[in-house]
Amino acid sequence: MTWGSKLRDLTPVERHGGMYFKRDDKFAPLGYGNINGSKLRQCIYLVDKWYDEGNLKGVASGSVSQSPQHAFIAAACRHYNVGCYIVSGVRKPLEHKYLRMAHEFGAHIVSSRVGYAQACGAQARKASLAWEGFRYLETNITLDLEKNSFRDIEGFHRVGAWQVMNIPEDVETLIIPCGSCNSVTSILYGIMMYPPPGLKRIVLMGIGNMGSNDIGYVRRRLRAVVEVNLGLDTDEYFDFNFASENAKYDMVHLNLNGTGYCTYQQEMREAIGDIRFHPRYEGKCIRYLKERAPEYLTPTTCFWIVGSDVM
């Protein structure tokens, strides 16, 4: 049985500390505490799709040394028994956790002279074009709107959209961490297809990348997918100006990075019950909510855990 057969399994919604948590960190094919989360699901979706199309011999990718995507992609490649070529901008990759994990999963890791994610990705893309049967998995585990078909992008987001289906009926506020924003795009797509009956408010928490610097990216992707597939107007559901006067849902954007609260590199360790939040992502969100926005921590709030750190 391939990991592709697990893509529609619903991760649980649990109560901890008097509120709900959507545990997408429990999408963990190798067991809880290993690689996990929404982005892993999307990574597996792509590799599984390419494998089913036939003649897949390997996957090439590139990103900064701290990116969890290295371990995700390498593990998926090992599962499907294909090669994995990773480009990163460090000379000693085994000193970095996710690159070390990728190496243990069997990836071939090379260094780029320029360590920026864009440069690493470009080098990986060039390699994928040169080698028969290799596919390029884009930096941040995404599909560029300009370089991929509508059908491929819609399928990529639909695999995460399913997870909305078990949001409890009494949830009124949904809080979503936003980094590269592919997970939140999938979640909002799911809300449009399978509206949780009690949902009134959506809080987007910017923790870097698009979530802090270009939250309109989510609207652009939704419009590209939803308006073609469902014939619905994205703006009738979500107001990305955050005025919420004419949209179905009250939208709030809390931008943590770049506003003086924290930087991307900082880590904040937080826990509620037995949940240990990722210190670079969800941990910052929980700390911010406790310190600056406690009004959202209510019994009818659900916090979406996109993923947790590897133990």
Predicted regions and their residues:
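Active-site-proximal loop->helix
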Residues: 46, 71-118, 213-226
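Positively charged, low-complexity intrinsically disordered leader regions
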Residues: 1-57
